[in-house]
Amino acid sequence: MIDNAYHIDSGYHYLVCNMDKQLNKAPTMNDEPAAKPPAGNKPLSVSSEQLLGEHGVAFIIHQGECYQLRQTKAGKLILTK
């Protein structure tokens, strides 16, 4: 069964329409680390709340392509190109 109940709000549309501006902004410093650094050879672990933020969406650049990770109302994660 496919869950198409995506989080859609004005903030989401702002992010999509201004994605280039968002990606080209200079990074800002934050006193809180996004995640604990990996210990030894363990992979990095990041909570979905930290990754998606208040808008419930994150843009991921992978090999020059932009992907969108978002959370559905049912709490599932959807990754689209």
From Swiss-Prot:
GO biological process: iron ion transport
Domain of life: Bacteria
Disordered as annotated region, ranges: 26-46
Stretch forming the signal peptide: none
InterPro entries listed in its UniProt record: Hemin_uptake_protein_HemP
Cross-referenced Gene3D superfamilies: Complement Module, domain 1
Transmembrane segments: none
Ranges in a coiled coil: none
Alphabetically ordered keywords of this record: Ion transport, Iron, Iron transport, Transport
Family classification: To E.coli YdiE.
Role: This protein is involved in the uptake of hemin.
UniProt protein name: Hemin uptake protein HemP
UniProt source species: Yersinia enterocolitica
Lineage: Bacteria, Pseudomonadati, Pseudomonadota, Gammaproteobacteria, Enterobacterales
